[in-house]
Amino acid sequence: MIQGGDPQGTGYGGSDENIKGEFTSNGFPNKLSHKRGVISMARSQDPDSASSQFFICHKDCPFLDGDYAAFGTMTDGFDTLDEIADIPTDPMDRPFEEQRIKTVTVE
């Protein structure tokens, strides 16, 4: 998976507010499966700790279903997803070279 959305760029940042986790194990029906291209909220161990960070599934991740709030699906750009997934990373899986999302379209 590819994770982003940290305003501090450290991997630990977020906003001042958290979002209630909208997934099955937290009492909210969410039938969107974590398949390749699905976008979901990142969080800590606390199910209601989602903030600004999100991740995009590079491969199918069915083990996340029911425990993470999937909320969107990519419709194109899978070649870019593959390119980002192939970028060299450090031992903490952070890319050596910063990656940025330049445009997003929500439909």
Predicted regions and their residues:
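Cyclophilin-like peptidyl-prolyl cis-trans isomerases
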Residues: 1-107
